């Protein structure tokens, strides 16, 4: 599912945005956050009960958040493997092998989990603001189209664009 989210996002962006400068700019929190958002959003279309879908969605974002916290702990708070293992044990991951694998994965790629997590959370926050401001005019399609039309950018720019659009429309 992950690669398909990026494929759609990238093809859509290339179709809508022709300015060459846009292709050299990199906004990983938007890009990875969108992929995470699209993945988690897509679970509602599975042939499953609402309870099962909620579990899948909550598990996905909880896992992203847990790994982001581990990333911050290791790289910003200088956790060693023991400290990470203790942290993970408090969150239900109790085997030393699992803790070691997570530590080695995160130590090799500083900051790699944060764009997925922070990007997803920012997109959800912006979506909620958009939904509240748009009121009865809100549809998921409207928000998703707007998000994709703008394309990869910083979240402050995305928010300004959305706020400007909302002022025009409401």
Model feature map: region roles:
Residues 3-170:
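N-terminal maturation segment of proteins
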């Amino acid at each position: 599912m992950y690669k398909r989210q990026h494929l759609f996002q990238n093809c859509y962006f290339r179709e809508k945005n022709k300015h060459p400068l846009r292709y050299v700019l990199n906004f990983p929190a938007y890009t990875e956050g969108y992929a995470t958002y699209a993945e988690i959003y897509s679970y509602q279309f599975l042939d499953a009960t609402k309870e099962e879908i909620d579990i899948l969605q909550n598990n996905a974002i909880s896992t992203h958040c847990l790994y982001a916290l581990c990333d911050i702990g290791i790289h910003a708070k200088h956790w060693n493997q023991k400290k990470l293992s203790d942290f993970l044990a408090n969150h239900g991951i109790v085997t030393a092998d699992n803790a070691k694998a997570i530590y080695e994965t995160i130590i090799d790629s500083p900051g790699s989990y944060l764009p997925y997590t922070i990007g997803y959370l920012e997109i959800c926050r912006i979506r909620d603001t958009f939904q509240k401001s748009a009121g009865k005019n809100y549809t998921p399609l409207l928000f998703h189209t707007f998000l994709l039309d703008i394309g990869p950018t910083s979240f402050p720019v995305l928010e300004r664009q959305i706020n400007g659009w909302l002022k025009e429309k409401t």
